[in-house]
Amino acid sequence: YGQFAYRINGGYMFHSVPCYEMKKDSLETEEFNKLGESASLGCVRLTVRDAKWICDNCPEGTTTLIYDDTSTPGPLGKPDTIKLPIGHEWSGWDPTDPDKNNPWLTSSARIEAENITTKIGVPVDVFKNVKAYDTCGNDITSKMTWYGKYTFDVAGTYYVTFKVTDAIGSKAEKQIKITITDPD
């Protein structure tokens, strides 16, 4: 069972990742985690959100141009993918499914970071305890960006802001305060 399908040509289709049963919470998790890889006999598997968009916005007969070149992924590039944690109580749901019963809709990208206090001339690793996670709880710290100015040479209060966007578009932002104090 697949929630959304759109015929490209002949037996080839765009379709959402299949479910084991005709229930939205019975997603084939292992197959979902293959999104972005060759995993089909010619069809193009998509998240529910993307397959639904095609069905809602592309009338029958819409011309389809498929890029099959790893060195040139086309004008939009190859999208990033999110992985579902195997065995998680919500792993039967596609995290992009807009169904109000989808438990992933209560989750989002998040950043964990704490304020820092140190003395003049005692540098600390501002990024040591900063972690970013996607909607499904996967570590995406490497995708995080930051901005702000600080120095360990002048007493004062400084702010650094961390931002991240996960593969399904969920965003998180966290600001920390860095307090530099005079030596005792």
Annotate each PLM feature:
Residues 57, 117, 151-152:
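Residue-level "contact hotspot" at macromolecular interaction interfaces
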Residues 63, 115, 173-177:
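Well-ordered beta-strand positions in beta-sheet-rich domains
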Residues 183-184:
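Low-complexity, Pro/Ser/Thr- and charge-rich linker/hinge segments at domain boundaries
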Residues 106-138:
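Solvent-exposed, low-complexity, repeat-rich "mucin-like" stalks and linkers
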Residues 138-180:
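Serine/threonine-rich, repeat-prone extracellular segments and beta-strand-based repeat modules
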Residues 1-107:
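Exported/periplasmic cell-wall-interacting domains
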